[in-house]
Regions:
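Core, highly hydrophobic multi-pass alpha-helical transmembrane subunits of bioenergetic inner membranes
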Residues: 1-293
């Protein structure tokens, strides 16, 4: 399909740039160890390659289009599991990464992720821009404290997985579909409101933890302006999360009184996994000191 081709070409191009960075460094220094890059052009190429693989702005062009062209199950894998390999490389090579470029991309990603999601009606594209914004927060702290990157990744995967599982359970591909999700599963729809607020970063929910820790780390390292811009950009993301929450839980799609409530007649489905994933997605804030050890 078109989405598959876009994903393959983008990842192949990024892998080629990554290999070229390693080759360039080996040519000038004589070592093939990618974690010890000392050649400046190779460091820049490595940063750009990993940014393209992750979908950081301005190299995020492929992510919304790819997610829009694939099923929700596959979109879940691409936004979570497929981020592990490039972020592992980012963690291992954080000493060789070009800090100003990565920090700039981090700020751009939070802004683009917020702005891009404002006018979207497709849930997959909204989750794509949400992913771009979250990755921007991760990128901004990578060269300062890579351990915070891992905490952020862990929480991001939990929250995004839960959100996609809820969308899959209610078969919601557009915001319009969310208006009828209450007929499929009222409890799931009610919990989706809290989960979306967590993704938006509202305290006292889990999503507040990475934003709080990252802003604290940036301020400690005298990057107050960067922290301010990123905190303001979080309001953009929060707006479209609120819009989805309002549509899904506080509005009712026009129906007749004879309309059947699907949840009464649907066979009982197992929501144990969603329930187990939902708990850490909204209740990890009190455990923050333990995560920071």
């Amino acid at each position: 399909t078109e989405a598959t081709t876009k994903y393959f070409l983008t990842q192949a191009a990024a892998s080629a740039v990554l290999l070229f960075a390693s080759t360039t460094n080996a040519w000038t220094t004589g070592t093939w160890d990618i974690t010890q890059l000392t050649n400046n052009p190779a460091c820049i190429m490595l940063t750009m390659a990993l940014s393209m693989k992750l979908g950081l702005a301005p190299l995020h062009f492929w992510l919304p289009e790819v997610l829009q062209g694939i099923p929700l199950n596959t979109a879940l894998i691409i936004t979570t599991w497929q981020k592990l390999a490039p972020i592992s490389l980012l963690y291992m090579t954080h000493n060789a990464i070009h800090p100003p470029i990565l920090l700039t991309m981090g700020i751009l990603s939070t802004l683009v992720g917020g702005w891009g999601g404002l006018n979207q009606t497709q849930t997959r594209k909204i989750m794509a821009f949400s992913s771009v914004a979250h990755l921007g927060w991760m990128a901004s702290v990578t060269t300062i404290n890579p351990n915070i990157l891992l905490i952020n990744l862990f929480l991001y995967i939990i929250m995004t997985t839960t959100a996609f599982m809820m969308l899959i359970y209610t078969s919601s591909k557009t915001i319009k579909d969310l208006t009828t999700s209450w007929m499929i599963s009222p409890p799931t729809t009610a919990m989706m409101l809290i989960l979306l607020m967590s993704l938006g970063g509202l305290p006292p929910l889990t999503g507040f933890v990475p934003k709080w820790v990252i802003l604290q780390e940036l301020t400690t390292n005298h990057l107050s302006m960067t922290a301010t811009i990123m905190a303001l950009s979080a309001l953009l993301s929060l707006f479209f999360y609120l819009r989805i929450a309002y549509t899904s839980t506080l509005t009712t799609f026009p129906t007749t009184t004879q309309n059947t409530n699907k949840w009464r007649f649907l066979p009982k489905s197992n929501t144990t996994v969603i329930s187990l994933m939902l708990l850490p997605s909204i209740l990890i804030l009190p455990m923050t000191p333990m995560l920071m050890l």
